A protein has these predicted regions:
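Catalytic-core regions of glycoside hydrolase
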Residues: 1-4, 8-227, 232-234
Length: 236
């Protein structure tokens, strides 16, 4: 019943919004911690436990079912779920190949100073895999991969820190493009939970500027992007 309700809503959404090509059916930040405000994203009743062995496979199976249900009525449209926290690690199975109309938004966090191609551990302390290996494992399951990228830390300790993710960010963009990423979403505030409420442009414009220009052309160097902007500021 839930599956059909979601499919019906997705079909209605695309009919109402014909210019949209993707709709999310994914969870938010829920990380499986009972103390998390997002914990309710994951039902753990007996039926749901029978549905899948873990959160990742539950999301994959659910997305596959919804994708099949909307395919005929929504040609050329896709649905998306997140590879994030409990669903970050690709499962060790080939039984859950992706539908053509299912997209996975893989969320890279951590490793803000590291190159993906050199081995960028997401969180070794809790046993998560190398980002690049995990990325390839999702591709091997047939998923179109979008990328959610946070170039700065979601921490109030960073709110007054001048931070530019330069050559690392640009090289990581190249790696993602070379490995088939179709869409990149940049997420970096301003969020009053961990950023300045006012005056954030003074300290964040270089980070955002390099990110934006780099997405237009990731073959530019850090100096190519930022030096002309700094010279214009100096001239003013």
């Amino acid at each position: 019943e839930v599956q059909q309700l979601v499919a019906d809503q997705i079909i209605d959404f695309f009919k109402t919004n014909p210019n949209y090509t993707v709709a999310s059916i994914g969870q938010n930040d829920g990380n499986g911690d009972p103390a998390s405000e997002d914990y309710a994203n994951w039902c753990e009743c007996d039926d749901c436990k029978k549905f899948a062995t873990d959160f990742t496979q539950a999301m994959m199976k659910f997305a596959k079912i919804i994708g099949q249900k909307i395919e005929k009525q929504c040609p050329g449209k896709s649905i998306m779920f997140y590879g994030y926290f409990p669903t970050f690690t690709a499962p060790d199975t080939t039984a859950l190949k992706a539908e053509d109309n299912v997209v996975m938004m893989l969320c890279k966090e951590g490793g803000l100073t590291r190159f993906i191609r050199n081995g960028n551990l997401f969180n070794a302390a809790i046993g998560q895999p190398q980002f690049k290996d995990n990325y390839q494992a999702w591709k091997d399951l047939g998923y179109q991969i979008y990328e959610w990228n946070c170039p700065g830390a979601a921490s109030d300790k960073w709110k007054d820190m001048f931070w530019i993710q330069g050559e690392v960010f640009l090289d990581n963009l190249k790696w993602l493009k070379q490995n088939g990423t179709q869409y990149l979403c940049m997420d970096q505030g301003p969020n009053p939970a961990y950023e300045r409420a006012d005056g954030y442009m003074d300290i964040r414009w270089p980070l955002w500027y390099v990110s934006a220009k780099g997405m237009w052309d990731c073959n530019l160097s850090f100096e190519d992007i930022l030096m002309p902007a700094c010279k214009r500021f100096k001239a003013v």
